[in-house]
Amino acid sequence: MTQTQPQINSGHRSTGTVAHLRPAYHVRPPSGYLNDPNGPIEHGSDVHLYFQSRPTLDLQAPVEWGHATSPDYVHWTLHRPAMAPQPGGPDTDGCWSGNTVLDDGRIRAFYSGRVEGRPYQSVLTAVSDDGGASFGPAHQVVPDPDEAVMFRDPFVWKENGAWWMAVGAGSVDRGASIALYRSADLSQWTAVDPLAELPRTRSDGEDTGSAWECPQVLTIDGRRIAVIASWSPEGGPGEVLSFDVDVPPAPQRVDLGTNFYAASALRESRFGPLLFGWLPEGRDRPGWNDGWAGVISLPRMVWLGPDSSLRSAPVPTMDTLRSGSASPTAIGAQCEIVVPEGVGEVILHFGDQERLQIELTDTTITIDRSHASLAPHAHGGRMIATDAFDPSSGRPAVRIFLDGSVVEAFTSAGRVLSTRVYPTTPPPWRLEAPANTQCWGLAR
């Protein structure tokens, strides 16, 4: 399975009236349903990124591992799926989320295999013998739990000479948890005490969940930081949260926008620790009218803020997408808007009745998409981040990346807000912003 598809931007053509909503520089297949990113890993001169993918919008179809590679985390090439369900095998109904590691120079995947009718997804492993383009047969490496609300999404890493595996879990009695296993050889695994546990807490509109999906473990400034996706049987996906596992958990949101879930970590990269995430649709299912849904976020460098929350910034190579200054009276669907400093309001006028408003105060950023779309199925609402700016950081007050229906805003203090917007009016659009604002068109 080494045949490649065309590069992402060449696969994003549409003759429909919503062509301007299709992201061009974010990772996504030309059609079908995409969700969780999986197993980013540097191998040779490239980074490999896998992701949950279905070839159509049929959510009952078995999940495959889509595959993309990049030399710089910005210019991506899509390939054929690297992993597909094995008929009659331990993943016959879906290859669900996990991660990858290097095992004697080969890429080894750990993931959840789904079989219809079984209460849990089994933790499986499979090896690639062709540089990550495809994976061989899978087998189970840890037993299914006796009882749990949920058990899935392994994350494997090496630390202090040993291999460790975190698995998302939850129980009725003890709440959400990260199950933990140890191995000397990636083959034989022994269960140890959970890495973290937390009874479900709900306050101020935030919910830590009754179980945790997609656990990731980073080491930042000598501290072990878990990144989890909160989940509950009645509510489904919640928020992406982070916390120090060596003190009583105090989860904090990783992204303060409306559309970010199922983060996937790369512990070590040329830019330090990184996170990717799934940017789900911000519109009801009847609005998925162009044959695709779901996008992978931009890769994010991460560090710890003064309050121990996880902060984010775009990778430096994002600058290579800049194709020249954009006129504020003729903004395209792919652009970067930069406010170097100060307060004010950034308004992207899509049409007479459609606009996206971003307000900057001394300490907060607010994104209001209440009037961003006249489409009946598009979501609205406002999102806010406090403690948003750090003038001493050397970073702009805010960098706003627009890619069709995707908006990702990064502030100087490392706050990030991701959302989706669906203007019915195609570009060119008009930008109203403070006088010092810079704007670039972005092109692959």
How should these model regions be labeled?
Residues 1-153, 158-207, 219-257, 270, ...:
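Beta-rich carbohydrate-recognition and catalytic domains
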Residues 426-444:
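Ligand-recognition surfaces built from glycine- and aromatic
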Residues 414-428:
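Short, solvent-exposed beta-strand-to-loop segments that form ligand-recognition rims
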Residues 335, 395-411:
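Short tryptophan-centered beta-strand motifs in secreted/extracellular beta-sheet-rich domains
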